Amino acid sequence: MGKIVIEPLSRLEGHGKVTITLDENGKPKDVKLHITALRGFEQFVVGRPAEEVPRIVPRICGICQTAHHLASVKAIDAAWGVEIPEPAKKLRELMHIGNMIHSHALHFYFLAAPDFVLGPDADPAIRNIVGVIDKAPDVAKQAIALRKFGQKIVEAVGGKAIHPVTGIPGGQAKRLTEEERDELLKDADQMIEYAKNGVELIKQLNEQYMEQIKTLGVIDTYYLGLVKDGKHNFYDDTLRFLSPDGKEKVEFKPEEYLNYIGEYVVPYNYVKHPYYKKVGYPEGVYRVGPLAMLNVCDEMETPLAEEYRKEFLEIFGFPANQSLAYNHARLIELVEACEKAKILLEDNDITSDDIKADVEPKAGNGVGVVYAPRGVLIHNYETDENGIVVKANMIVATTHNVPTMEKAIQQAAQVIFK
């Protein structure tokens, strides 16, 4: 028996490696995906005043920092029984949408596109964003513009483009001025067009690689996502499980997550393996993120994105189970995010100064959930009577996907090593 070790994994938001164990015939026998960095944020926040935590947890991820900021402050609001004003909720949602635009553009164009635009057999020295700029400069310019637009939204609403600070218990610390709104709104229509161009691009690229898409990393799993009245939603928090055959849907609220999600400790990893409790481990492992979201929802929230979702399911089937279809799904979500940004920017509430409710620290337990760029993100805090965090649990989006990524790598390895 031998081993193939891939370390480090490149173009990854974090640190990891893959170990493929081969049998006596040189065929894959076992695959393990190792997340090699100990993070420890669940312990970092214990003993801290809860109002400090939304400024600490964005450091979990330099790309998804806004999602952590908002899941955190939503958890504190829930723990203290706070109902925030509607304009504050819309501001938070706009901030979150800005992060989705930035991250989805970065994820596809900077991390995934080099393999598709330049081809998987291209020299690794040029198979990167610089190579994309050289081969497809117009595509690269649109990608950069989308990222810039998303970051401008986060900066205007969140106070900073990286690690925003304006989400506070009870609402928002900063209103959006009319001038800031108008500055963002003038670019909204163009960004929708750029996002649509992204979907058309991935459809063209998929045609070249459809054999690989439909044979590598194809696995049947459960799916978990966020919906609001059955519609795809980035921010509001009804969670929905979908069965592998697409026939069973189970919905639950954030505060019920421990009744539905278990975490299995594996000895070779710094992350636990989440699973659907009703089914058990490992049969109940599930996927989150764009592919899962398009499967889980009944329809998209915005019209253009819904047209693209219907087309997506015609191509890949329902539920779509191809791991390489994540890129297509992500670009459909990018269209929805740009459409949603325009809707929120045109809402009169978005420049309201009614953005803060009074709060009093107290003992409580609260759960905050958002759909982060990589999938469902859960923050759960318990506070004492002084508002100090005494216990914290976080299930980060990528953590949900680790066991199913492992399964997908194993399936792909078996196909490649035939």
Curated annotation (Swiss-Prot):
Gene Ontology molecular-function annotations: ferredoxin hydrogenase activity; nickel cation binding
Swiss-Prot/TrEMBL keywords: Metal-binding, Nickel, Oxidoreductase
InterPro entries documented for this protein: Ni-dep_hyd_lsu, Ni-dep_hyd_lsu_Ni_BS, NiFe-Hase_large, NiFe/NiFeSe_hydrogenase_LSU
Cofactor: Ni(2+)
Binding site for Ni(2+): 61, 64
Enzyme class: oxidoreductase
Subunit comment: The F420-non-reducing hydrogenase vhu is composed of four subunits; VhuA, VhuD, VhuG and VhuU.
Extra remark beyond the main annotation: The large subunit of Vhu is split into VhuA and VhuU. Each contributes two ligands to the [NiFeSe] center.
Protein name: F420-non-reducing hydrogenase vhu subunit A
Organism: Methanocaldococcus jannaschii (strain ATCC 43067 / DSM 2661 / JAL-1 / JCM 10045 / NBRC 100440)
